[in-house]
UniProtKB/Swiss-Prot annotation:
Subunit record text: Homodimer.
Source organism: Salinibacter ruber (strain DSM 13855 / M31)
Residues the UniProt record annotates as site (Important for catalysis): Y145, K191
Lineage of the species this protein comes from: Bacteria, Pseudomonadati, Rhodothermota, Rhodothermia, Rhodothermales
Catalytic activity, reaction form: (2R,3S)-3-isopropylmalate + NAD(+) = 4-methyl-2-oxopentanoate + CO2 + NADH
Compartments it resides in: Cytoplasm
Protein name, per record: 3-isopropylmalate dehydrogenase
Keywords on record: Amino-acid biosynthesis, Branched-chain amino acid biosynthesis, Cytoplasm, Leucine biosynthesis, Magnesium, Manganese, Metal-binding, NAD, Oxidoreductase
The protein's required cofactors: Mg(2+); Mn(2+)
Gene name of the encoded protein: leuB
SMART domains: Iso_dh
């Protein structure tokens, strides 16, 4: 690439703390862009509850179209108690499902890292959790959440778990490709001792692995995997699983760092990637400059990975770690005897340290 690389970002601040945490993510993107020779242009669009209030739709057509025309989508958070009684397509969260469908994404990436500086914040023993670095690769469009038939019957209810060979194969390829960039180990999680769908899952994943002999593969039943995530999380590198099991396991692992404010996510595989923090809109602290922007900033790092700016993505992660190592803590992480860093102050620290982690005119890798 030349020195005129540029990326158009569809910025969806959303509700609650979404605007303030993604604002810091954009600050960091601009800082590392200057250091790595690319520019970022972010254009704001409405989504979620704020879009409902203004347009009557949680995902206006104009927002959807802008996302499809962008290089990446950065989302803050959607929803809140104001819209808690809404149903169907009048729920703010329905806009997120519609956006994922429009973008065609099928792979959800959920990194869970416990930086050494924050090991004491974990509910687990620091010597067991410190240094944890797991990437959950969750299939996002199939499984029991979308299988048919489903619904209430005269005497009960039914849900259907279903996967096709192709759906399993494509998500397995994502997991093996990501493992090659990391430590080269994939743990595939299923329930093949009970479920026929899981038997197929294990068979197809094993077949895909035949084409990736440089990556190590092991299989775990989901109940054992849940125990192992708590017992020894550092054993995992990439965890590959279906929609239901991935939903549960990634939320279980989300407790390891000690704050949802540290957890980013990406939904990829379609025309454009969607990047968002795992946490919700937290309306009770919105607008107070106290929210932790780390998850949004690390989501921006995933965005950079996806568009090929891997050195800049690593610089962002280094900036977060450096700020934490220097003792900067937002309110959710600060000890009683520590001074809190505001949302904006923490974002500035990360931006400065991320930009300074490489020479100003570093060559493109």
């Amino acid at each position: 690439m030349d020195d005129t690389r540029s990326y158009d970002i569809a910025w969806l601040p959303g509700d609650g703390i979404g605007p303030e945490v993604t604002r810091e993510a954009l600050r960091v993107l601009e800082a590392v862009g200057s250091a790595h020779g690319f520019s970022v242009t972010a254009t704001e669009h409405r989504m979620g509850g704020v879009a409902l209030d203004e347009t009557g739709m949680p995902l206006p057509d104009s927002t959807r179209d802008a996302c499809l025309e962008s290089d990446a989508v950065l989302l803050g958070a959607v929803g809140g108690p104001k819209w808690a009684d809404n149903t169907g397509d009048q729920r703010p969260e329905s806009g997120l499902l519609a956006l994922r469908k429009a973008l065609g994404v099928y792979a959800n990436l959920r990194p869970v890292r416990v930086p050494a500086a924050l090991a004491d914040a974990s509910p687990l023993r620091p010597d067991r959790v410190g240094g944890t670095d797991i990437l959950f690769v969750r299939e996002l469009t199939g499984g029991i959440y979308f299988g048919t038939p489903e619904g209430r019957t005269d005497d009960g209810a039914r849900s259907t778990m279903a996967y096709s060979d192709d759906e399993i194969e494509r998500i397995a390829h994502v997991a093996f490709q990501r493992a090659r960039r990391r430590d080269g180990n994939v743990t595939s999680v299923d329930k093949a001792n009970v479920l026929e769908v899981s038997e197929l899952w294990r068979e197809v994943v094993t077949e895909v692995h035949d084409d990736c002999p440089d990556v190590t593969l092991r299989h775990l039943y989901v109940d054992n995997a849940a125990m192992q995530v708590v017992r020894d999380p550092r054993q995992f590198d990439v965890v590959l699983t279906g929609n239901l099991f991935g939903d549960i396991l990634s939320d279980l692992a989300a407790a390891l760092p000690g704050s949802l404010g540290l957890l980013p996510s990406a939904s990829v595989g379609g025309t454009v990637g969607l990047f968002e923090p795992v946490h919700g809109s937290a309306p009770d602290i919105a607008g107070q400059d106290v929210a932790n922007p780390t998850a949004a900033i690390l989501s921006a790092a995933l965005l950079l990975d996806e568009v090929g700016e891997t050195a800049a993505a690593d610089a962002v992660r280094h900036g977060v770690d450096a700020a934490l190592d220097a003792g900067f803590r937002t309110a959710d992480l600060a000890a009683d005897n520590e001074e809190d860093a505001s949302t904006s102050a923490f974002g500035r620290e990360v931006a400065t340290r991320a930009a300074d982690s490489v020479p100003q005119n570093a060559p493109t890798p």
